[in-house]
């Protein structure tokens, strides 16, 4: 009986250690995604405020800063690299900068909706001034469910957060706080792709 009890205790300890390690790895993925998104946002801000390219001083060490961060899962890394590379190309080419800035403007609405979807799916509060949009989004999601249609842009919260991170744009202070709350909630919930 004592041997069986020790075995169960040891097994429980190993399972707890493995679970803690898995949570730590998941947290590292979310932290890396957040860091890469912030780095991309820095470049987006430079595109928005840039005079004439090139912005060599501002982008110096980009590869080094990026490479100091651990890699994301391959599909995620590709999407974030695409955002980073598009911003760097816009910083190096004036014609590309105008197109990229226009893309950021067009993506503002999409980013706002994704952030609202994330708050809704994670049960987080939205700012009071966004309650009308949140209600409209809830109605839209209910309508989709009742029509039994595929949910375009739906999917797990992690995938929606990746979509938000991969979309060019600059979050204001309020949206940055909201995004950080989303990252924290996903990390806490242990949601992965």
Spell out what each predicted region is.
Residues 1-193:
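Coiled-coil/CHCH-like alpha-helical segments characteristic
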């Amino acid at each position: 009986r004592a041997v069986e009890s020790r075995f169960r205790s040891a097994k429980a300890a190993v399972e707890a250690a493995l679970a803690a390690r898995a949570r730590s790895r998941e947290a590292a993925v979310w932290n890396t995604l957040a860091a890469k998104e912030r780095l991309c946002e820095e470049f987006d801000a430079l595109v928005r405020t840039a005079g004439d390219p090139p912005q060599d001083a501002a982008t110096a060490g980009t590869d080094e800063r990026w490479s100091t961060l651990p890699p994301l899962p391959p599909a995620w890394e590709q999407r974030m690299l695409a955002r980073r590379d598009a911003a760097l190309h816009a910083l190096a080419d004036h014609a590309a900068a105008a197109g990229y800035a226009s893309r950021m403007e067009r993506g503002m609405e999409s980013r706002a909706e994704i952030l609202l979807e994330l708050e809704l799916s994670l049960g987080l509060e939205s700012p009071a001034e966004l309650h009308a949009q949140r209600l409209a989004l809830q109605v839209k999601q209910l309508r989709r469910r009742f029509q039994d249609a595929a949910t375009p842009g739906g999917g797990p919260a992690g995938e929606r957060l990746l979509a938000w991170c991969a979309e060019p744009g600059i979050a204001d202070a309020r949206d940055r706080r909201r995004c950080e709350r989303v990252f924290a909630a996903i990390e806490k919930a242990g949601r992965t792709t």
